[in-house]
Amino acid sequence: MPSYTLHYFNHRGRAEICRMLFAAAGVQYNDRRVDCSEWTGMRNQMPCSMMPMLEIDNRHQIPQSMAIARYLAREFGFHGRNNLDMARVDFISDCFYDILDDYLRMYHDKDGRMMFQRSYDNGSSSERRMRFQETCRRILPFMERTLEMRNGGNQFFMGDQMTMADLMCYCALENPLTDDTSMLSSYPKLQALRNRVMSHMKMSPYLKSRSSTDF
């Protein structure tokens, strides 16, 4: 088994999908949580000067959260059984990532840096919030219909197999649902899916024991 180190801030953010995949697979890894005060000094050491970054065997470095997530999903068996399955898992995951990305961008400063503060006002929060809301209006009905296509939406996006797509549904909507608990009231299948992920035998212990952070 390779050794893994996941580098990210002490927040869920764009790395949580990767942490959830490790938890679902039961694979040990070094969860390196970088303090924001450390970041300036180490930024240029990171590929693309960004995190998250996955380090494998202290030799290989993979940047970009969804590239990391896809790699782990393939390695651990959470990316579908064939190429068509993988394409379905990918487009579902990317749809939820669009929601996550637009949400987090409401808390970026003018230089594009994540502020990790709910009270932060970047001066264009209204415009960015409208974009986030439009993304949700565009994507959530489609995701509800997509889920219903397999077993009436009563299991997972791929039927009886939990994949990265289901984990993305959970983690991408965590903060938005904190802001608006009725967000999924028109999407009961998605709400039930998130409950299934939360009660999964591998996910439940992880979700209960992980660090509590704002983002």
From Swiss-Prot:
<dbReference type="GO" id="GO:0006749">
    <property type="term" value="P:glutathione metabolic process"/>
</dbReference>
<dbReference type="InterPro" id="IPR036249">
    <property type="entry name" value="Thioredoxin-like_sf"/>
</dbReference>
<dbReference type="GO" id="GO:0004364">
    <property type="term" value="F:glutathione transferase activity"/>
</dbReference>
<dbReference type="InterPro" id="IPR036282">
    <property type="entry name" value="Glutathione-S-Trfase_C_sf"/>
</dbReference>
<protein>
    <recommendedName>
        <fullName>S-crystallin 2</fullName>
    </recommendedName>
</protein>
<feature type="domain" description="GST N-terminal">
    <location>
        <begin position="2"/>
        <end position="80"/>
    </location>
</feature>
<dbReference type="InterPro" id="IPR050213">
    <property type="entry name" value="GST_superfamily"/>
</dbReference>
<dbReference type="Pfam" id="PF02798">
    <property type="entry name" value="GST_N"/>
</dbReference>
<comment type="function">
    <text>S-crystallins are structural components of squids and octopi eye lens. Contains relatively little GST activity (1/1000 of that of mammalian GST enzyme).</text>
</comment>
<dbReference type="InterPro" id="IPR010987">
    <property type="entry name" value="Glutathione-S-Trfase_C-like"/>
</dbReference>
<keyword id="KW-0273">Eye lens protein</keyword>
<feature type="domain" description="GST C-terminal">
    <location>
        <begin position="82"/>
        <end position="215"/>
    </location>
</feature>
<dbReference type="InterPro" id="IPR003083">
    <property type="entry name" value="S-crystallin"/>
</dbReference>
<dbReference type="GO" id="GO:0005212">
    <property type="term" value="F:structural constituent of eye lens"/>
</dbReference>
<comment type="similarity">
    <text>Belongs to the GST superfamily.</text>
</comment>
<dbReference type="InterPro" id="IPR004046">
    <property type="entry name" value="GST_C"/>
</dbReference>
<dbReference type="Pfam" id="PF14497">
    <property type="entry name" value="GST_C_3"/>
</dbReference>
<dbReference type="InterPro" id="IPR004045">
    <property type="entry name" value="Glutathione_S-Trfase_N"/>
</dbReference>
